């Protein structure tokens, strides 16, 4: 029996994706503890920790000979994964700007929504597996889960627009200091679509994963060498941009100036990177649990991030003083997001059951 089959567990896969979504929703919180540093300075530390240190340490800890695997991998596949990561890097740079203008709840709802739709539906089509999206009970259920998650995202977005119309600027800016819906919406659209490059990259390293398995890595951790390459592409963009801003804004001294809590800043900025990277570690380790329905993992990851980020937004007061209608839209949207994850988990169960079923008797 195939090793991957032995590890298939759709319910556990959905839970792992959901934990990744939680990490994606809260990674920004440690930045609030960074004192007297420019954005580019703490984002640089975040990038070094989350895009370089964590993935490489994890790859060497969980994978058999990751360097050897990457040396044997097709150069074209490595380049594509790297470039997809760089595409994400361009989108990821504006993720923080999106949150600055829209707040955690609304910003991640719109950005993750576009990222979810693009990153879930496009990879199977590019790989010539369009038929995987429909035709069997498990595929139909998984597609239904994706559609429901997108419906939930739309409702959360509608609730956000309703909130934007209802609240006076002073209340909105009390919760989100630089609130600007128009700027935020434009940034979120760009960031969401470009950030889907992460999904393309993480799902585009099949040969690398096969080599990792052949080297003796378990099915659960076979994707770590792919993660390293994709995040390296993202790091390149983030590093160059932050370095440019450090030079332009004369903030290179942030890393050494004595009047700031240097150790605390390094710890909290680095912690944000570690938490952020955790969502994609969860994505790659959850994939093998889903079997043939692994492509829906991106939708579950994004839906979970929106669910948890919206709940965090509620906790932070971003939805305070809104109308019953707005809160109702928000509540229904959150229920749909939660329900989509349940349906996606059930789709994996259907797929597992269909494979376990004995073939029908053939009449002579």
Model-derived regions: residue spans:
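Polytopic alpha-helical membrane proteins, predominantly small-molecule transporters/carriers
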Residues: 1-364
């Amino acid at each position: 029996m195939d090793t991957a089959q032995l590890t298939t567990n759709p319910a556990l896969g959905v839970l792992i994706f959901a934990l990744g979504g939680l990490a994606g929703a809260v990674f920004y919180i440690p930045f609030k503890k960074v004192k007297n540093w420019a954005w580019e300075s703490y984002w640089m530390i975040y990038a070094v920790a989350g895009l370089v240190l964590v993935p490489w340490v994890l790859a060497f800890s969980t994978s058999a000979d990751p360097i050897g695997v990457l040396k044997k991998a097709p150069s074209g596949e490595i380049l594509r994964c790297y470039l997809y990561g760089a595409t994400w890097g361009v989108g990821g740079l504006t993720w923080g700007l999106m949150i600055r203008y829209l707040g955690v709840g609304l910003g991640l709802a719109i950005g993750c929504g576009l990222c979810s739709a693009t990153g879930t539906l496009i990879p199977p089509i590019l790989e010539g597996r369009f038929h995987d999206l429909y035709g069997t009970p498990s595929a139909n259920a998984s597609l239904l889960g994706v559609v429901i998650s997108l419906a939930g995202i739309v409702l959360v977005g509608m609730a956000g627009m309703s909130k934007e119309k209802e609240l006076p600027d002073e209340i909105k800016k009390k919760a989100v200091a630089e609130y600007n819906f128009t700027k935020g919406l434009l940034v979120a659209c760009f960031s969401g679509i470009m950030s889907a490059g992460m999904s393309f990259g993480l799902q585009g390293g099949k040969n690398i994963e096969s080599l990792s398995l052949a080297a003796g890595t378990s099915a659960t951790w076979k994707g770590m060498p792919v993660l390293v390459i994709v995040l390296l592409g993202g790091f390149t963009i983030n590093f160059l941009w932050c370095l440019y801003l450090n030079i332009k804004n004369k903030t290179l001294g942030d890393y050494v100036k004595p009047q700031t809590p240097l150790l605390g800043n390094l710890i909290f900025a680095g912690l944000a990177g570690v938490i952020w990277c955790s969502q994609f570690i969860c994505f790659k380790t959850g994939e093998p649990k889903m079997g043939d329905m692994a492509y829906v993992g991106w939708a579950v990851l994004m839906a979970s991030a929106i669910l948890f980020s919206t709940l965090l937004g509620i906790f932070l007061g971003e939805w305070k003083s809104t109308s019953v209608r707005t809160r109702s839209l928000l509540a229904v949207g959150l229920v749909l997001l939660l329900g989509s994850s349940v349906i996606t988990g059930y789709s994996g169960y259907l797929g597992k059951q269909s494979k376990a079923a004995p073939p029908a008797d053939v009449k002579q």
